[in-house]
Amino acid sequence: MVEVRVPATSANIGPGFDCLGVAVNMYNKFFVEEIEEGLIFEGCADKFKNENNLIYVAMKKCFDKIGYKPTGLRIKIESDIPVSRGLGSSAACVVGGIVSANELAGGALNKKELLDLAVEVEGHPDNVNPAFCGGMTASISDNREVIYSKVKVSEGIKFCALIPDFTLSTEKARAVLPKSIDYKDGIFNVGRTALMISALNNGDFHLIKYACKDKLHQDYRAKLIENFYSIKKQCEKLNSLGVFLSGAGPTIMVMLREEDKDFSKNIKSFLETLKNKWEVRELKIDKLGTVVNNCKV
């Protein structure tokens, strides 16, 4: 049996639309073994127990590339990453599927080939890269090749995810974005993306609140998330370092100083006054990324 653990990811980090992403310590685990025949799923809803399951789709893509044909598969899922909340649940399934398939087939593909294949299936390198490699990454796709670099994050920072009880599909969140942007808005984001990376690198945490600003996606998507601005304002009042939409949303991610012990209980009290229910979850950066049989890929 192959055991694969994949972390949740938070993409964009404010201005770094479709390029920045960070892995956090919330995980999906996949236990996969080859059986004599059939396709058996455990740990997921009945509607996902078929060949359209994203984990199986990713596995088949890997098997086809290698030229391996399993006799049958048993796939058990232990999921801690909420679906359609902007925390990289799709990327976790794709990476978990591809890596487990490669292990079953004898490890025919190297790390670079696995990464390129995962991005081909999932489509978002800003989620796939940190899920695969851990830490924070800056990623691009160049002629179908995935290029990325690790972003050094100074010690002393943690994250807090505010996770609502409602979902928001990536497709719906993409549909509200404009077809084109003003030149000045592009410049606005380029500058703040550079500032974000530099501030995290150098421990200039007081600059993060400026770096979190963005003109490419967050304001458009905020309209789909009830109370987004009131929550953001309250987070700022509680001395957060920065607040941004996690991926396409609806989860709101907050950056905090490591020593901040009061934020979670205080924001929880505020969120309890709102109509929707929100889970408050403090998180740390996952530095390992995908782990196979307790070993880093």
From Swiss-Prot:
Q: Mind telling me which SUPFAM superfamilies this protein's record contains?
A: GHMP Kinase, C-terminal domain (SSF55060), Ribosomal protein S5 domain 2-like (SSF54211)
Its Gene Ontology biological processes? threonine biosynthetic process
GO CC annotation, single:
cytoplasm
Q: Which reaction does it catalyse?
A: L-homoserine + ATP = O-phospho-L-homoserine + ADP + H(+)
What is its pathway? Amino-acid biosynthesis; L-threonine biosynthesis; L-threonine from L-aspartate: step 4/5
Specify which residues bind ATP according to the UniProt entry for this protein.
Answer: 82-92
What EC number(s) does this enzyme carry? 2.7.1.39
Compartments where located:
Cytoplasm
Q: Which HAMAP family match?
A: Homoser_kinase (MF_00384)
The protein depicted here goes by the name Homoserine kinase
Species assigned in the record: Clostridium botulinum (strain Hall / ATCC 3502 / NCTC 13319 / Type A)
Q: Which gene encodes it?
A: thrB
